[in-house]
Regions:
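Active-site hotspot residues in diverse enzymes, especially metal/ion-binding acidic/histidine motifs
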Residues: 1-257
């Protein structure tokens, strides 16, 4: 609605970029050309809140603000870099600190987590409800994982193929065969500092074991939660399992994940 009548061609092509499944884009910062330098909307952040991207909206907003504070906007057309690009990772780091300013966030976090052995979704939701109502669950969860001293691994799982199948699907074929069904895999894995120091992780794209609460929740309705005490030795790939390690798993079903 906002872009209509603004006479800015750049807005017209954004949906195509946001729909590109091979280069996930959550937002873009635009410097408008047909407006004065003193216009309040000279710089516009466009944030994709559709589907599973909705969970990242708060973080994406601060990511684009970080661009404005540092790299500014692309004057002609936004550059849609990969989320793994070093510049984008730097913007994520800035967004995480600016969006949850430490002198304000830390006292709230300490109060909410006082007496808790592990970081839980309940702690995250308590922080949102009490002090940061505009923050998304995911962004607040990331802010919490950066501050806990216990190893935490954030994981997103969805249907995907193993690397060999992906390569075959990317190769053009004379036959229009249907692709094999995907398996539930860990498509995004993020460690906090404590987990990195302890070498505690789950390899990206590893198949989620059927006995894990993550797998059991996948076909539930969105916003369904579950938790369990599990062992990393459940995770297996090509006949090899992860090193045995007792873990507490808390999972939430969201659209597409």
């Amino acid at each position: 609605v906002y872009a209509r009548g603004k006479k800015e061609f750049v807005f017209a092509g954004m949906r195509t970029k946001f729909d590109d499944a091979n280069n996930l884009t959550y937002g873009a910062l635009v410097q408008r050309r047909h407006v004065g330098d003193d216009a309040p909307d000279r710089f516009v952040a466009v944030i994709d809140c559709r589907g599973s991207k909705l969970a990242r909206r708060f973080f994406t907003r601060w990511h684009e603000i970080a661009h404005r504070l540092t790299t500014h906007a692309d004057k002609l057309e936004p550059v849609y870099r990969s989320e793994h690009d070093p510049l984008e990772r730097l913007m994520d780091e800035i967004a995480g600190h600016v969006g949850f300013y430490e002198p304000l966030f830390d006292p709230v976090f300490r109060s909410a987590s006082d007496g808790k052995v592990h970081l839980t979704f309940g702690v995250v939701e308590s922080i949102i409800a009490s002090t940061f109502p505009a923050a998304s669950f995911q962004a607040t969860l990331f802010a919490c994982t950066r501050r806990v001293t216990t190893p935490v691994v954030y994981l997103e799982a969805t249907l995907a193929h193993k690397k060999e199948v992906k390569r075959k699907l990317a190769t053009k074929s004379l036959f229009d065969d249907d692709p094999p069904p995907g398996e539930l895999r860990a498509v995004k894995v993020i460690q906090n500092k404590a987990a990195h120091a302890a070498r505690f992780t789950i390899p990206t794209n590893m198949r989620v074991p059927a006995d894990s609460v993550i797998h059991k929740l996948f076909n539930f309705e969105p916003q369904t939660d579950g938790d369990a005490q599990e062992d990393l030795s459940l995770w297996e790939s090509q006949g090899r399992t992860l090193e045995a390690r007792a873990v507490v798993v808390e999972a939430r079903k969201v659209p597409g994940r």
